[in-house]
Amino acid sequence: MKKALLLLAAAAACAIALPATAARNKTLKGSGRIVTETRDVGSFHAVEAGSIAHVLVGDYPAGRVTVKTDDNLLVHVQTSVAEGTLRIGLADVTVQNAELTVYVPAAGITRLDAKGIAAFSLETPLAGITGLKAGGAAKITAEHPLQTNDAAIEASGTAHIAVEAMTGTLERIS
């Protein structure tokens, strides 16, 4: 009797949880109509990107980012700063056939963290980098050598980090 009640309770919990999860993460298809929006985000020293974000780090105005994406996805793009970290990604949706490019100022950045299939392209020399981290199928590439005294580089999954560094101490964590 106890087993039957336990199984019934577990089945009821699954029946409630599965539709709630599916509703929270709906799938959107990119419209193909690309729009651009500039957002004031304040100051930050680290950037964390997830989802399908392609983040271009370069000589852009400080304190703001520019988001380029399909018009129907713009409201789902998160660009928020908490504890000095700019977080970029999509909120509560998965996407198909979509673009998400975010232009981020290089000034003052010390740490980059790419997750999922996010990609960072470093367009300008960066000084003072202390950490690069990529997980999942994420990618970090740099057009110019990084200038740093101490840096930790960590890649997991099928992630790829391709950078040159002029450094005092470089620690590779895999």
Name every feature range the model reports, one short phrase each:
Residues 1-174:
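Intrinsically disordered, low-complexity terminal regions
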